[in-house]
Swiss-Prot record:
Entries under PANTHER family matching the protein: ARCHEASE, PROTEIN ARCHEASE
Role this protein plays: Activates the tRNA-splicing ligase complex by facilitating the enzymatic turnover of catalytic subunit RtcB. Acts by promoting the guanylylation of RtcB, a key intermediate step in tRNA ligation. Can also alter the NTP specificity of RtcB such that ATP, dGTP or ITP is used efficiently.
Gene Ontology biological process: tRNA splicing, via endonucleolytic cleavage and ligation
Similarity comment text for this entry: Belongs to the archease family.
Pfam family of the protein (one): Archease
This protein's UniProt keywords: Calcium, Metal-binding, tRNA processing
Chain positions recorded as Ca(2+) binding sites: D12, D138, I139
Annotated protein name in UniProt: Protein archease
HAMAP family: Archease_arch
Source species of the chain: Sulfurisphaera tokodaii (strain DSM 16993 / JCM 10545 / NBRC 100140 / 7) (Sulfolobus tokodaii)
């Protein structure tokens, strides 16, 4: 199963992330967002950051997960390439970890900066044996 794909969207970037379960789909969504910004295969998992959030529904958890990671990028210039997510669907909480390193222009390709997560076209689909997360990021 592919981890993610991009789709055309006027002035922004659409992402479809896939996973065998909801946690994996959220992890792959994060990889996709950082792949927009750089080649994540060149981002070493040297430092770890934690994210603990709650939401009012799964879409809000997805929004807040990506938003939290972008805050680390904006405040520390952190790029991430490895993620761990544990979602409690009953209580709508997410505990996640992201591993990466600070942006180094000599090592990391500078692609398009993701400015923000959006709710535009957001959809979380449970297909029985896999999940599809669809969303758009502002660039």
């Amino acid at each position: 199963m592919q981890k993610f794909e991009f789709f055309e969207h006027t002035a922004d970037i659409g992402i479809r992330a896939y996973g065998r379960n909801l946690n994996e789909a959220f992890e792959n969504a994060a990889v996709a967002v950082f792949e927009v910004m750089t080649d994540t295969s060149k981002v070493e998992p040297k430092e770890m950051r934690e994210v603990k959030i709650d939401g009012y529904d799964l879409e809000n958890l997805l929004y807040r997960w990506i938003e939290s990671l972008l805050v680390y990028y904006d405040s520390e210039i952190m790029l991430f390439s490895k993620f761990y997510v544990n979602i409690d669907e009953k209580n709508l909480t997410l505990e996640g970890k992201a591993w990466g390193e600070k942006f180094d222009p000599n090592k990391h390709e500078r692609r398009t900066v993701v400015k923000a997560m959006t709710y535009h076209e957001m959809k979380i689909e449970n297909k029985g044996n896999y999940y599809i997360l669809t969303f758009v990021v502002d660039i």
